[in-house]
Amino acid sequence: MLSIMDMAGTYYLGLFCGYFSIKDVIRWVDDVIDKSESPISNDLIELSLSERQSTADVGSKLLRILQNEYTDRPMNIILGLCYKKLVLAPENDDVMLYLYRLSKQSSLPSDYINNSIISLSDEFYLATEGIYGDRKVVVSDMIGFLEPFEVYANGFLEEEAGSK
């Protein structure tokens, strides 16, 4: 079972990179509030009421929930979700944009992951612009790189399905 902190971290990163929308965040926090058997924090209530606020404001509220306690799990979940999306639609360039934005985030679990994402993003750009390389090969390489993170996405998706 994922903690609220892990879920908030996942939604923060997903919102930051464009994988999740504000509506996704609100849906999640409303579900947490509905199912909670203990008192609800003011931060969760404020987040629930943030539908008309900017992405930056919603992100700030998610960070308040995190209380500066970061783990690698949220990033691993987002990488796994990107894997699943890329496998389902390899022609969809959105995943590469998500990954590029994540590479700008300071909470990547390791330099290896950061360097791999940057390298594959650069290769993807060169291939799609017809400068160098084959787009299908780069997408295949990205799928191979992201595959180990699938298990994290599966846990997140099971948690999401169980909460509905």
Where are these regions (language model features)?
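Acidic, Ser/Pro/Thr-rich low-complexity regulatory regions
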Residues: 1-164
